[in-house]
From Swiss-Prot:
Family annotation (NCBIfam families): lumazine-synth
Protein name: 6,7-dimethyl-8-ribityllumazine synthase
Similarity annotation: Belongs to the DMRL synthase family.
GO biological process: riboflavin biosynthetic process
Gene for this chain: ribH
Disulfide bond sites: none
First-tier enzyme category under EC: transferase
Subunit comment: Homopentamer.
Reactions mediated catalytically: (2S)-2-hydroxy-3-oxobutyl phosphate + 5-amino-6-(D-ribitylamino)uracil = 6,7-dimethyl-8-(1-D-ribityl)lumazine + phosphate + 2 H2O + H(+)
Length: 160
């Protein structure tokens, strides 16, 4: 899997000691399971032992569980997929999840990386899921972003 255009290469991270929480939905299980596998691999490769993993049914439940994880974790990864349908439901769910994740991150001063795919169709989600024939691994990217931000915050807070 070669990186997509414009995607920065993730440097090797030493995140040992970082407490990582991962919340992943179960809708579109093949995709969400792959996103979770990518996030777990990045965590393990970065020295994170035993991240807390919580599964929820749908994407709309992700922010409240991320909020609870942010209470006692240094970083949180939110994973899921919302695929456009025939009704405005797609926009409502995408907006609620995105705003919820952002609010949790800011309110808790804890990085919550948004790895929730919002796509027009299932193929677009599969292309981003980190499967062997996928173009990208958004689960891995989200985990890398969360861990990198947690390390940056740790460094900034140590200066204070």
């Amino acid at each position: 899997m070669s990186p997509a255009a414009g995607v920065p290469e993730m440097p090797a991270l030493d995140a040992s000691g970082v407490r990582l929480g991962i919340v992943a939905s179960t809708w579109h299980s093949r995709i969400c399971d792959a996103l979770l596998a990518g996030a777990r691999k990045v965590a393990a490769d970065s020295g994170v032992e035993n991240p807390t993993v919580v599964r929820v049914l749908g994407a709309i439940e992700i922010p409240v569980v991320a909020q609870e994880l942010a209470r006692n974790h240094d970083a949180v990864v939110a994973l899921g997929v919302v695929i456009r349908g025939q009704t405005p439901h797609f926009e409502y769910v995408c907006d609620a999840v995105t705003q919820g994740i952002t609010r949790v991150s800011l309110d808790a001063s804890t990085p919550v990386a948004n790895g929730v795919l919002t796509t027009d169709n299932e193929q677009q989600a599969l292309d981003r899921a980190g499967l062997p024939d996928s173009a990208e691994d958004k689960g891995a990217q989200a985990a890398g972003a969360a861990l990198s931000a947690a390390l940056t915050l740790r460094e900034l807070r140590a200066r204070s």
